[in-house]
Design a protein with these regions (language model features):
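Domain-level recognition of nuclease-like catalytic cores that cleave nucleotide substrates
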Residues: 124-183
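Mg2+/Mn2+-dependent nuclease catalytic core
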Residues: 78-123, 133
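Generic structural motif
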Residues: 74, 87, 138-141
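Active-site metal-binding core of divalent-cation-utilizing nuclease and nuclease-like domains
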Residues: 3-84, 100, 123-125
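A ubiquitous, low-specificity "background" feature that marks scattered single residues
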Residues: 10, 50, 74, 89, ...
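Short amphipathic alpha-helices and their capping/turn residues within compact interaction modules
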Residues: 12, 16, 111, 115-118, ...
Length: 183
């Protein structure tokens, strides 16, 4: 996916990977410190488990949990990380829960890109990184104000937003119908 996005033309991908590794190692060290504190209290070293390459957190940037899409606005030098979440609309806070999951999922990637962008020089200088999250409920629920705000951020003209939202809701309902047929 990353080769197709041309992110490497904007920011050196090796730098992004290096920053991600630093963030992941810092997180692991904090987790180990926390686990060590608990282990001392419990006197049970068997419960300490080190993370490895199969760690889902590590997959945020390198594996299956990559973002759904990436959009690049060359004029304003903005890199958009796009994530679409489909969640149960039975709870009133379905949108907030979906947004939290997406932020957590892409935290390392976004922070890595932001750090490398801040340190960039020459043609790579001046880029910003934004995570745009679209959340839809299982029954086609969409928070209109947030959805329109996201489309506005992406530069979609107001006259096109309702049609795009209707298409999004249609896709949500098709996905739900597919799930129900196979249950």
């Amino acid at each position: 996916m990353w080769a197709e996005t041309k992110i490497g033309d904007i920011l050196p991908w090796e730098d992004v990977e290096g920053e991600a590794e630093r963030l992941l190692e810092s997180t692991r060290a904090n987790a180990r410190d926390s686990e060590n504190s608990r282990a001392i209290q419990e006197q049970d070293d068997d419960r300490i488990v080190d993370r490895d390459e199969t760690d889902p957190y590590n997959e945020v940037i390198f594996g299956r949990r990559r973002p759904d899409s990436v959009a690049i606005e060359w004029t304003s030098k903005t890199l958009y990380i796009l994530e679409f979440k489909h969640t149960s609309a039975q709870r009133q806070d379905y949108r907030e829960c979906g947004e939290f999951r997406a932020r957590d999922q892409h935290d390392v990637l976004v922070k890595s890109l932001e750090t490398v962008a801040k340190e960039a020089e020459g043609d790579s200088a001046g880029w910003t990184v934004k995570l745009i999250i679209f959340v839809g409920g299982t029954c086609g629920s969409v928070h209109v104000q947030t959805f329109n705000s996201n489309l506005k951020e992406l530069g979609v003209v107001e006259s096109k937003r309702n049609a795009i939202r209707r298409g999004f809701v249609h896709e949500l309902l098709n996905a739900q119908d597919t799930v129900e047929r196979f249950e």
